[in-house]
Amino acid sequence: WRMITQEKAQVIVMTTKEVERGRNKCIRYWPPEGESKEYGAYTLLNAKENDFRDYTWRQFVITKESDPPYKQIIYHHHFKVWPDHGVPSDPGGVLNFLHEINECQRSLKNPGPVIV
């Protein structure tokens, strides 16, 4: 989370499933919806989740007790149907996902880089 705050990133894109074919592919780096979790000096709140057919959209709020206090909203886009090997069979899902990411990034004043 230090890198996210250092770069002032507001958009995270994840294309990996957490588990595929019974194997862990990614460790969950966010708390369940409505809950907070501490990551070192940072506290991350998973404020909201919207689940769609091919992806999940989350809104995080990251804070840090500092002088001055730090608070940032982060948008997490998680594409859930990318296969372990190859590419998705339906490009429409990927294109819709990319459209949502681009719209989100454009709507922010100073979004920083997209973190993938």
From Swiss-Prot:
Name of the top EC class for this enzyme: hydrolase
GO molecular function, one term: phosphotyrosine residue binding
Protein name: Tyrosine-protein phosphatase 14
Any single GO CC term annotated in Swiss-Prot or TrEMBL for this entry: cytoplasm
Keywords (A to Z) from UniProt: Hydrolase, Protein phosphatase
SMART domains named among the record's database cross-references: PTPc
Family of this protein: Belongs to the protein-tyrosine phosphatase family.
Catalytic activity: O-phospho-L-tyrosyl-[protein] + H2O = L-tyrosyl-[protein] + phosphate
Record-listed substrate binding positions: 84
Domain Tyrosine-protein phosphatase stretches: 1-116
